[in-house]
């Protein structure tokens, strides 16, 4: 083995290998360059390492001759004529440029395009995802390019359902690098939102109208600037191809096609997602994005994913309601039994009064003449006392009202004894009904049947929520006729 130390470029160093050498170890500017050239060269492969870059190739018969000629000419010229020629300088410059292109601005090796190139060569599908948060906002995870356009980053964007799509467009524009227009001025790229159109009358691009417009312009301009007209036709052809790409046959509909349509930027995000939920995805198109990122497919969450936090909150509230419902059920049962005992006690008092009047009227010397005014006055006094009682408590004069009053009074005492706060109970019931109503609305959007008993977890919780809804619906029905009478 012969070691050569030279400051000449790679080609000159290779020419220094003579025909008789079996292998050569070449060191160039403190960089190890290994080249094994066994003679009589039975192998055709060689590998050169320069600044960490591996270059492989095939050695042909012509290369062998060039090595031989270079070696012989070097022996004839001598050491003083070993000056780098233009071809050698071009070779070194090309390798340096290749090495510089493989590093980004921060000096990190990006391996020829970074993750964008890797994803495109592997054929991976770059897609985003829409998630929900406990605060009932949407979290959009979308892959976007960095400023140097050599890498892809997952960007998380929090959006409110009542915000317009234009707000989401501005958020995406702030994360992507600007593009240059025809005048060389930088501007934010245009962002469009496309969703599947499930109606039968799909909106189709009228390509014939564009072609007719081009022909008319060409005729008016007198046939000049054919390149501009041809370019405009290519643009419309690209638009038509884009819409052809955003087209797929409907499931179970034979040859019928489903098309995607672009939504206005003034549409609320909640309405857009509600419509895109039927197709389970929508597309975000970014102007000037690298290959593979012009159309980002964003997966819309399913019903279970969309209502996950709502159902978890409902289950948590249901467990609290269940613990209170057990104690409340015992207190209510005791209160009802107490009210029944009060009613039976009132009947016993009336029966005892009837027996006294009978005894005093027919079995004593008082007789009917004395007992008649007594019974009349006692009955009238009882009626007047009851009337005053209903006026004082502002209640309707009925047995049901008196029974409810008795039950409620007994319930309050029992609740205080058991440590139940009615305000907490009512707030939990109202919140559970509100969450249930929201989940029902989302289920209607997704066209699914939601079994509320699985999340409410107990029949007593279901009955408590249903009872509260009935009370509210009954009060609303009673208030509506009153409002109508007031309007009249």
Curated annotation (Swiss-Prot):
Q: Where does it sit, as one GO cellular component term? A: mitochondrial inner membrane
Q: Name one GO molecular function term.
A: calcium channel activity
Q: Where is this motif: Selectivity filter?
A: 368-376
* A single BP term in Gene Ontology: protein homotetramerization
Q: What is its main location?
A: mitochondrion
Where along the chain is composition biased (Basic and acidic residues)?
86-112, 475-488
Indicate whether Glycosyltransferase appears among the record's keywords: no
- Provide this UniProt record's keywords sorted from A to Z: Calcium, Calcium channel, Calcium transport, Ion channel, Ion transport, Membrane, Metal-binding, Mitochondrion, Mitochondrion inner membrane, Transit peptide, Transmembrane, Transmembrane helix, Transport
Q: Which residues bind Ca(2+)?
A: 372
- InterPro entries, alphabetized: MCU_C (IPR006769), MCU_fam (IPR039055)
Please describe what this protein does.
Highly selective calcium channel localized to the inner mitochondrial membrane, which mediates calcium uptake into the mitochondrial matrix. Mitochondrial calcium homeostasis plays key roles in cellular physiology and regulates ATP production, cytoplasmic calcium signals and activation of cell death pathways. Sufficient to operate as a pore-forming channel without the need of calcium-sensor or auxiliary subunit.
- Spell out the protein name for this chain: Calcium uniporter protein, mitochondrial
Q: Which organism is it from?
A: Neosartorya fischeri (strain ATCC 1020 / DSM 3700 / CBS 544.65 / FGSC A1164 / JCM 1740 / NRRL 181 / WB 181)
């Amino acid at each position: 083995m012969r070691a050569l130390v030279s400051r000449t470029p790679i080609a000159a160093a290779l020419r220094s290998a003579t025909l008789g050498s079996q292998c050569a170890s070449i060191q160039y500017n403190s960089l190890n360059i290994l080249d094994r050239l066994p003679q009589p060269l039975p192998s055709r492969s060689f590998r050169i390492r320069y600044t960490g870059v591996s270059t492989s190739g095939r050695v042909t018969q012509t290369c062998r001759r060039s090595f031989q000629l270079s070696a012989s000419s070097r022996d004839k010229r001598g050491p003083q004529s070993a000056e780098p020629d233009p071809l050698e300088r071009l070779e070194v410059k090309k390798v340096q440029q290749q090495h510089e292109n493989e590093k980004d601005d921060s000096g990190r090796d990006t391996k020829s395009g970074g993750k964008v190139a890797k994803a495109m060569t592997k054929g991976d599908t770059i897609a985003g995802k829409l998630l929900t948060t406990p605060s009932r906002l949407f979290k959009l995870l979308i892959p976007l390019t960095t400023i140097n356009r050599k890498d892809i980053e997952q960007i998380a964007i929090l959006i409110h359902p009542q915000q317009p799509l234009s707000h989401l467009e501005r958020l995406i524009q702030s994360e992507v690098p600007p593009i240059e227009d025809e005048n060389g001025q930088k501007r934010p790229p245009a962002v469009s939102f496309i969703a599947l159109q499930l109606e039968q009358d799909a909106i189709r691009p009228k390509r014939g109208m564009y072609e007719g417009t081009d022909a008319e312009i060409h005729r008016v301009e007198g046939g000049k600037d054919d390149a501009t007209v041809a370019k405009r036709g290519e643009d419309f052809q690209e638009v038509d191809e884009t819409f052809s790409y955003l087209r797929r046959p409907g499931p179970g509909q034979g040859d019928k096609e489903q098309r995607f349509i672009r939504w206005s930027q003034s549409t609320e995000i909640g309405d857009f997602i509600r419509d895109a939920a039927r197709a389970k995805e929508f597309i975000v198109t970014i102007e000037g994005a690298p290959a593979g990122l012009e159309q980002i497919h964003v997966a819309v969450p399913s019903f279970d994913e969309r209502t996950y936090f709502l159902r978890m909150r409902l289950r948590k509230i249901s467990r609290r309601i269940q613990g209170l419902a057990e104690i409340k059920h015992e207190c209510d049962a005791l209160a009802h039994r107490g009210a029944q005992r009060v009613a039976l006690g009132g009947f016993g008092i009336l029966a005892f009064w009837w027996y006294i009047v009978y005894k005093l009227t027919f079995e004593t010397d008082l007789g009917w003449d004395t007992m008649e005014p007594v019974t009349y006055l006692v009955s009238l006094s009882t009626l007047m006392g009851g009337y005053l009682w209903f006026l004082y408590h502002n209640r309707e004069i009925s047995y049901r009202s008196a029974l409810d009053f008795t039950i409620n009074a007994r319930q309050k005492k029992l609740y205080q004894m058991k440590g139940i706060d009615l305000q907490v109970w009512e707030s939990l019931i109202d919140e559970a009904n509100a969450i249930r109503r929201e989940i029902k609305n989302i289920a209607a959007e997704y066209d699914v049947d939601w079994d509320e008993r699985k999340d409410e977890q107990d029949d007593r919780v279901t009955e408590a929520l249903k009872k509260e809804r009935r009370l509210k619906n009954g009060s609303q029905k009673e208030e509506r006729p009153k409002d109508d009478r007031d309007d009249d």
